[in-house]
């Protein structure tokens, strides 16, 4: 009898863990984000259906190139729930990424989304790194029409090694995928992470850490 109860409890635990391991299913056609609501939820509260218009499902602007006049030489134009309220609860978003010659989308992660990247113009060198302990690097040169997947939560990058502009379109599996740029987070946090900690982590002298932090 005890073994039967143990089996049932184990089965219940597995069922509960599976239930909470993914986003809940939609219970209605859509839930347009009410960005003025004071209700605090994971995402946005739903807008009054009577106030929803077609504009809640529309965005215009991906035909325009982003401004790549920056130190990295790249620009990301995001289309997520912040731009299209109708994306709320739908689990998807887009981004146009522009790369100047030798432009870089530096190593970063999306904590809440897998990314699938399509090259619209030009060629890119892309890659991602697996988790500890292997930290295996996967890289590929992509050309126009090629598609590449960056798994959720893994560090990845894109580099335009050529002399012409590159355009790519990224689809992400979250209405709000988030982004953490590794260098910015490690060396540009507010306040700074102690240079004692970073010097030991990277096995360099503190003055080198201080010099890097000064760039942020």
Swiss-Prot record:
UniProt main location, coarse: secreted
UniProt-listed Pfam families: Cupin_1
UniProt cross-references to CDD domains, sorted A to Z: cupin_OxOx
Disulfide bonding pattern of the chain: 31-46
Assigned GO CC terms: apoplast
Protein name as it appears in the record: Putative germin-like protein 2-1
Family classification: Belongs to the germin family.
Signal peptide residues on this chain, from the entry's feature table: 1-21
UniProt domain Cupin type-1: residue ranges: 60-210
Keywords for this protein: Apoplast, Disulfide bond, Glycoprotein, Manganese, Metal-binding, Secreted, Signal
Organism of provenance: Oryza sativa subsp. japonica (Rice)
Binding site for Mn(2+): 108, 110, 115, 156
SMART domains membership: Cupin_1
GO molecular function, one term: manganese ion binding
Lineage: Eukaryota, Viridiplantae, Streptophyta, Embryophyta, Tracheophyta
Self-association and partners: Oligomer (believed to be a pentamer but probably hexamer).
């Amino acid at each position: 009898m005890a073994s039967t109860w143990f089996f049932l409890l184990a089965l219940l635990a597995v069922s509960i863990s599976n239930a909470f391991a993914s986003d809940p299913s939609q219970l209605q056609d859509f839930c347009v984000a009410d960005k003025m609501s004071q209700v605090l939820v994971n995402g946005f509260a739903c807008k009054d259906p009577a106030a929803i218009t077609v504009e809640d499902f529309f965005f215009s602007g991906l035909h325009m190139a982003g401004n790549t006049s920056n130190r990295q030489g790249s620009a990301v134009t995001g289309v997520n729930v912040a731009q299209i309220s109708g994306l709320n609860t739908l689990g998807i978003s887009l981004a146009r990424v522009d790369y100047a010659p030798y432009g870089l989308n530096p190593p970063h992660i999306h904590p809440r989304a897998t990314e699938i990247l399509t090259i619209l113009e030009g060629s890119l060198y892309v890659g991602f790194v697996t988790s500890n302990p292997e930290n295996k690097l996967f890289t590929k040169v992509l050309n126009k029409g090629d598609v590449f997947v960056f798994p959720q939560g893994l560090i990845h990058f894109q580099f335009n090694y050529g002399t012409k502009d590159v355009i790519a379109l990224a689809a992400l599996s979250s209405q709000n995928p988030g982004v953490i740029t590794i260098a910015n987070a490690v060396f540009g946090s507010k306040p700074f992470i102690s240079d004692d900690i970073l010097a030991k982590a990277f096995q360099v002298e503190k003055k080198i850490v201080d010099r890097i932090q000064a760039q942020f």
